[in-house]
Every structure is written in structure tokens, then in C-alpha cells.
């Protein structure tokens, strides 16, 4: 089985700049293959092994979902009771709680995270009205679980989820002893410590064998009807739906249950094929996802008849269409934690626009979509304390209604080729047309 796995992994690491890759396959509750290649620490020349833990990024979400569902089965919380902001736990688990996109990371062991998540934990749409991937929704789930059980998420997940499955080394934490060093896309090491306001969305650590086992054994923890509800996925695209903490394939082909994860120095994925009794985990210690994807496609292509990448990889891009807004100027504000920040937008010929905020202006291409009148990204710094921490780019996504452009402004950073991965901060935005 997978006799050429070593050569495939070596090629993927070389072609895509991944220091290491760890792979595991489990069948009916037993690990049947576990291999690791490359270096867990390039500076110290420490090899990766099958016992090396890796950061999981968003593959943490299925663990948090399992903890919430266990608490529900124990009668400690109700998946359909409205909670913070009016969203139910079921809606939050499905990323349908109405909360916008967000992530924040603080690197190193010292100091406190610089971004307070509270001002960003707001509704951008009515709960239940649509899908939007929301780390802060999983932050709220962690709070709900803690209020219901009296234990913080990490402790409860260890005692009621991971421990009962025999996965004692699997954890939610700010660091993990012996873990693979995380590396930027150009090979620089990240600091060992990592903190965020959304640990239940992002701060899992595990070895590949542990993750492969979790991906197929979590239903043992739940009542049959709850396990079935986890896989009751609402469509998010042609080939995928999102259930309670897992992506679930749709349409023709094998049933696949999966979740990927990516952040600074992390590209991870877990996939199970319940009808075959198989699960696979692939972990790497680089921001770039290409090596992970190449290895995963090879393994699943060999083991799962009918596998196609679109059955596990959500595509959140929205097709563009030509801009229909006339040339002219718009003015308004971005609502930031400090208050309203002035913003001006000038529509230019050739599907371009000039954006001005504070003392910075930039011209960039813009486009429309079926739901947005205008979207674009500009190399301008939103002049707020939070954005200055690590979000030097400003994206705008605006719809047109009743003569006004409304939507959101996203302060973020493109990748980690300079410094480390920054934060993604969503702000309400409203502009009105200026007289010509």
C-alpha cells in the first residue's frame, strides 16, 4: 500500500518548500500506516517523526464541535437555544451564526495579545441567513461550553473527548512540547508560542496518527442521532456542505468528511471515508498548502475510489463580473473600535478605484460580483491601533442599496513573506455618493 509514498512526499517537499510532512492512515480504529519525512526543526536538524506533534490551525474546529456535542448529549446545553447575539450553537457550529470573518494571532511567549476581539464579535448578517466562515463563532462556542460545563474548553476536550478516545497527546493549547517548528512560506521560523482570541478554532496540536484516529472515532462519543446531526451538512458549494464542525461531500462520489487548516507555519488536513472505514491525516509545518494538498491527493487517490479534490477542498471564491458603478466619488466611514474612521472612494475609468483613509491613498483594480457592487484590495493602512498591529492592506466589499454603498472593510495582510502572518479584522462600512 502506497509503496511510493516516500518519493511522493520528498517531491512535494522539494517542489513546494515544506520542511517536513507527516502522514497517517487509520482503518477501523487502528493506525495502519504512519510515516514522517523531512525536518521538524531545520535549524537544529531535528527529523520529523510519527511522534512529532504539529499545530492544526482550523482542524481544531472538529474537536471543539465534538466537545459541544458531548455537552449537548449530557443535557448541559441545547444546540438550538439562542445564545450570544441570538445565534444558536448549531448555527455557530455550521458557520451560520451571522458573524464575519476574523483571525488574530500573537506570536511568542511574552506580552498580551494586542487585539481585543470583543468589538469584532458582532453580527454582519442575521443568524441562520447564510454561510460565512467565522473563527469568532467558535470563540463563542468555547464560552458557551465553559458556561455549561464549568470547565474551560481545553480541559473539557481532554477529559470528555480526547482522553476517552485514547488520544492523550492531542491537545488545545498555546504551545506543545516537541512540536514541529512552524515556518513562513520563505523558510523563516515562527516563535514557539502562539496565542489567539479563538483557541477553539485554531490552537489544536496532534501527531498525524492521533489526528487520523480522531477523524474516524469521534462518533463513538455521541448519541447516534447527534452523530448523524454532525453530518447533516448545509450546502456551501456544488460539492461540499458544512455540518457541525466538519465539511461533508455532496453529490456523486464517495462520502468524505474532512477539515483543513492553515495559518502561519501550518497546513493540515484530516479526511475520513466512513463507508470504507478509512481516515487520513496529513500535517506540514509551512504556511504553503501545496505540499499538503499534493500528498493528500496522492494518498486519497490510491485509497478512495472516485476521489476528487473538490470533495474535500471548499472553494470560497465568488466569480467576478464587470463593474457597473459610474465614475464618481463616494464618502463615508468605517466603524472601528475607536469610532468612525473617514473613508473616500473614487471610481475611475478602466475598472479601477482610488481609496483614501487617514493620510494614505492608493489606486487598485476593482470588480463586482452577483451580490456585491464593488470589491477590491488597496495597499493602505486603516489608521486604527488594531490595524497597525499587523494588517497593512484594506479590502472593501460593498453592496448597493437605496443609493448607498454598504458592507465591510477588511484590514489584513497578504501572506508572511515579510514578517509573520498578520490579523484579519472586519469593520462595517458605509459610503454615500458625492454630488458631481
Feature locations, PLM:
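Contiguous, well-ordered beta-strand patches that form the walls/edges
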Residues: 358-404, 414-415
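Short, surface-exposed loop or secondary-structure junction motifs
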Residues: 30-32, 41, 85-264, 268-269
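Short, well-ordered beta-strand elements
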Residues: 269-271, 276-286, 408
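Short, gly/Ser/Thr-rich active-site loops of penicillin-recognizing serine hydrolases
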Residues: 283-344, 349, 411-436
Amino acid at each position: 500500500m502506497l509503496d511510493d509514498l516516500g518519493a511522493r512526499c520528498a517531491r512535494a517537499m522539494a517542489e513546494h518548500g515544506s520542511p517536513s510532512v507527516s502522514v497517517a492512515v487509520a482503518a477501523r480504529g487502528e493506525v495502519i500506516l504512519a510515516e514522517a519525512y523531512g525536518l521538524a526543526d531545520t535549524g537544529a536538524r531535528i527529523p520529523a517523526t510519527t511522534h512529532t506533534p504539529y499545530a492544526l490551525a482550523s482542524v481544531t474546529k472538529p474537536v471543539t464541535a465534538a466537545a459541544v456535542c458531548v455537552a449537548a448529549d449530557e443535557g448541559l446545553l441545547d444546540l438550538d437555544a439562542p445564545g450570544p447575539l441570538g445565534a444558536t450553537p448549531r448555527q455557530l457550529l455550521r458557520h451560520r451564526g451571522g458573524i464575519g470573518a476574523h483571525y488574530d494571532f500573537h506570536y511568542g511567549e511574552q506580552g498580551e495579545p494586542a487585539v481585543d476581539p470583543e468589538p469584532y464579535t458582532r453580527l454582519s448578517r442575521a443568524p441562520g441567513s447564510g454561510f460565512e466562515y467565522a473563527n469568532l463563532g467558535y470563540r463563542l462556542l468555547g464560552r458557551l461550553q465553559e458556561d455549561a460545563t464549568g470547565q474551560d474548553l481545553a480541559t473539557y476536550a481532554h477529559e470528555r473527548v480526547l482522553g476517552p478516545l485514547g488520544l492523550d497527546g492531542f491537545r488545545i493549547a498555546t504551545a506543545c512540547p516537541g512540536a514541529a517548528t512552524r515556518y513562513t512560506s520563505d523558510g523563516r521560523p515562527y516563535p514557539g508560542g502562539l496565542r489567539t482570541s479563538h483557541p477553539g478554532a485554531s490552537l489544536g496540536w496532534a501527531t498525524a496518527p492521533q489526528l487520523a484516529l480522531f477523524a474516524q472515532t469521534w462518533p463513538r462519543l455521541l448519541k447516534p442521532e447527534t452523530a448523524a446531526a454532525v453530518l447533516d451538512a448545509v450546502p456551501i458549494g456544488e460539492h461540499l456542505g458544512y455540518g457541525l464542525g466538519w465539511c461533508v461531500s455532496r453529490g456523486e462520489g464517495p462520502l468524505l468528511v474532512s477539515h483543513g487548516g492553515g495559518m502561519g507555519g501550518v497546513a493540515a488536513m484530516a479526511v475520513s471515508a466512513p463507508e470504507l472505514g478509512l481516515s487520513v491525516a496529513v500535517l506540514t509545518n509551512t504556511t504553503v498548502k501545496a505540499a499538503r494538498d499534493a500528498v493528500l491527493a496522492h494518498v486519497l487517490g490510491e485509497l478512495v475510489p472516485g476521489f476528487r479534490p473538490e470533495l474535500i477542498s471548499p472553494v470560497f471564491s465568488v466569480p467576478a463580473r464587470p463593474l457597473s458603478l459610474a465614475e464618481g466619488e463616494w464618502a463615508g466611514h468605517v466603524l472601528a473600535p475607536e469610532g468612525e474612521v473617514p473613508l473616500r472612494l473614487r471610481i475611475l475609468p478602466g475598472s479601477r478605484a482610488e481609496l483614501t483613509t487617514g493620510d494614505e491613498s492608493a489606486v487598485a483594480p476593482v470588480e463586482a460580483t452577483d451580490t456585491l457592487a464593488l470589491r477590491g484590495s488597496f495597499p493602505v493602512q486603516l489608521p486604527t491601533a488594531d490595524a497597525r498591529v499587523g494588517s497593512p492592506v484594506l479590502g472593501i466589499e460593498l453592496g448597493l442599496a437605496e443609493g448607498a454603498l454598504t458592507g465591510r472593510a477588511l484590514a489584513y495582510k497578504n501572506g508572511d513573506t515579510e514578517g509573520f502572518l498578520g490579523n484579519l479584522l472586519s469593520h462595517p462600512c458605509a459610503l454615500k455618493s458625492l454630488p458631481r
